[in-house]
Amino acid sequence: EKIIFVWPEGILPGISQEKIVDYKWLFENHFNENHLLVLGINSKSVQRDTVKYFNSLSVYDHSLNLLSSYDKNNLVPFGEFLPLENILKNIGLKTLTNNYQSYSKGSERNIIKINKSNTSLKFLPLICYEIIYSGRIFNNSDFDFIINISEDGWFGQSIGPKQHFIH
């Protein structure tokens, strides 16, 4: 039986796409070829002397081979990026996201397509509050389902989780 495990963003603090392979032994011992793992994880891109960090949704097989990844397009101001960062860092406001610089925006949203071991699925990847932009994201309806990963625990007992669920 095929099983997709979906874990929220931030579930593995301090572990990025490049570091998750350090845990390959754990996944190989507890997951099998019928399992896929979808999780929120930080990723980075290095081009020349510029490092960009992304809030990403990544899909792995049971051996932690990266099958596909999506970088969040719509970032939360003051939560994932610091507006006017170049000005505000001069007064001490430099980092907001686990001591990284601001996250960078992903460049595009593509349907994630997985074709592996008799498994074929297509889903629309969303991270957290991107679901509220549904008018803009449903232009391409060539997917089987939506996976929206979110870590709403920081909302506490506020109205935030209820508002998020409505969308």
Which residues make up each language-model segment?
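Solvent-exposed soluble domains appended to multi-pass membrane proteins
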Residues: 4-167
